[in-house]
Amino acid sequence: MVKFKREVNFSGGDRGVYRPDLIRNICIIAHIDHGKTTLVDRILEITNTVDRRKMREQYLDMMDIERERGITIKAQPVKVMYTAEDGNTYEINIIDTPGHVDFSYEVGRSMAACEGAILLVDATQGVEAQTVAHTYLAIEHDLEIIPVINKIDLPNANIEETALEIKDLLGVSENEILLVSAKEGTGVKELLEAIVKRVPPPKGDINGKLKALIFDAKYDNYKGVIVHVRLFDGQVKPGDKIMTFSNKKVYEVQEVGVFLPEMEPVDSLSAGEVGYIIAGIKEVSDARVGDTITSANDPVDEALPGYREIKPMVFAGMFPGLPEYYEELRKALEKLKLNDSALYFEPTMSPAMGFGFRCGFLGPLHMEVVRERIEREFDLAVILTAPNVRYRVKLRNGEEIEITDPSKFPDEGEILEAYEPYVDLSIITPSEYIGAIINLVQNEKRGELRITENAGKNRVILRFDAPLAEIIYDFFDRMKAVSRGYASMDYEFKEYRRSDLVKVTILVNKEPVDALSFIVHRSKAYQMARKIVEKLKDLIPRHQFQIPIQAKAGGRIIARADIKALRKDVLAKCYGGDVTRKMKLLEKQKEGKKKLREIGRVTIPQEAFLALLKIGGEDEK
């Protein structure tokens, strides 16, 4: 047994001896709003990890936006010391994971660092689509799963039905399912006992070569990149030379520590433990999530298995509200990128909008969160164009290209074949809404129903193949509307399929506005174009001259609407008198408007761009 001094004052009792058999590493799988952050709050209270005076709701959700929206975005680890009924004090590392579909990449990171998972299900909602997907992921990672039914204190809790759904999903017996009220604290002690009894301790050799998994990284203005790690073998302490496996860069460790949940320095981290390393790393891109950290002097031969690079799924143009704030927007995106490895951006130039950035996101919620954070944390107004996906195009000259910006989509004459991404879409819904959901996906969103599965009493899982472009607009809101809020969804990229795509260009006052152009399936081009020109007609303010708004596809105008000119009464001063005088004044006004129309610039308000995000479903609602 290796002993070394711990300089940390754990409120749950310090231990001076390294005991891997007393370590438990777990993550929490739950759908959005099923109470996982509240459960962690109760665990922090019961184990006295956080002083009662400092305790607040959603303690681990560090961002204001997380607390306001009630969602977890950044997975936040915490270590608690728990004295169990067997008299031993256990070190439990909990990683609270995000539950929204856009942030599932964080869940994969968390699982790779754990031996066990708490499957948390809301007794009033039952098992949701996202939970099913994450449970399969946990089974793939070979995690010991502890099923827990939460919110048992609520009057509408359906415990028996929820237990049946969990049994179907996991194949467990009823006495393995724990009943908890995270809000009241009921059953939390029993859950902690189940963790120490059922989750296996980490395997690993403290005397082996250093092998640590990076499962997250965040940027600090003073300390540089703080790398969140789980050690599998070996030991790391200040002064050690370490190397990141993917790029072979070498750093000297300045500080190691644990999360209580605030960062607390310790003498060293050993095999099986979860903590952080500060080593003067300047950029988060050098500490890639899923990468392996090893000793620079005695490196391991191979990296820890299977972490794939995150690829953005949804793209949009982002422009500053005023052109002079371009530099500030660039700095804001760079700062966000430090803590968000999934965010991608590159400079772009639009004749209509000026200089801005083409950004890549994991999904529509991720896009919304980034926009909101820029507006809040950096006090910048930004204009976002309509989101779109990554298309593949085979040109007649044999070249193959990828398109993320609709304005760069080639002319029809150059295209041999176009492909768009399809996803495997799973929707769990009560039986009475099956017809409405199938109609929404198949008739409105070009999806194809593949399989229908039973998901417990009066609930079914519908599996579709659907184009990603149809999912990113307003699909989530439409699905909730047609199912009265009861349906839940999850999607995963499946493949690229050949598709009849067309670019629709919007012209305002006969000038193309590239930021308003979009790519759509030919069958929906007229319908979408009609809606957009009508919407823009309402949103663009009237000018001194008439403004035509046109939608052009395949070289011809497919929709048009006109904004009437503001008309000044030039005859107000003419009291009777010569009719030719009146004609002359009206003619002069007409000439002036003609000139204005030629040189006049039309200002397009931000609402016009935001309107594009909402087009597609609201007329059918």
UniProtKB/Swiss-Prot annotation:
Biological role stated in the UniProt entry: Required for accurate and efficient protein synthesis under certain stress conditions. May act as a fidelity factor of the translation reaction, by catalyzing a one-codon backward translocation of tRNAs on improperly translocated ribosomes. Back-translocation proceeds from a post-translocation (POST) complex to a pre-translocation (PRE) complex, thus giving elongation factor G a second chance to translocate the tRNAs correctly. Binds to ribosomes in a GTP-dependent manner.
The protein's name: Elongation factor 4
The tr-type G domain, residue ranges: 21-203
CDD domains named among the record's database cross-references: EF4_II (cd03699), EF4_III (cd16260), LepA (cd01890), lepA_C (cd03709)
Domain of life of the organism encoding this protein: Bacteria
Compartment list: Cell inner membrane
Biological processes annotated in GO: positive regulation of translation
Family the entry assigns: Belongs to the TRAFAC class translation factor GTPase superfamily. Classic translation factor GTPase family. LepA subfamily.
Membrane topology, as annotated: Peripheral membrane protein
A GO-annotated cellular component: plasma membrane
Gene Ontology MF term list: GTP binding; GTPase activity; ribosome binding; translation elongation factor activity
PROSITE patterns (UniProt xref): G_TR_2
EC annotation from Swiss-Prot or TrEMBL: 3.6.5.n1
Catalytic activity line of the entry: GTP + H2O = GDP + phosphate + H(+)
Organism annotation: Thermotoga maritima (strain ATCC 43589 / DSM 3109 / JCM 10099 / NBRC 100826 / MSB8)
InterPro entries in the cross-refs: EF-4, EFG_III/V, EFG_V-like, EFTu-like_2, LepA_C_sf, LepA_CTD, LepA_IV, P-loop_NTPase
HAMAP family: LepA (MF_00071)
Chain residues that bind GTP: 33-38, 150-153
Annotated keywords: Cell inner membrane, Cell membrane, GTP-binding, Hydrolase, Membrane, Nucleotide-binding, Protein biosynthesis
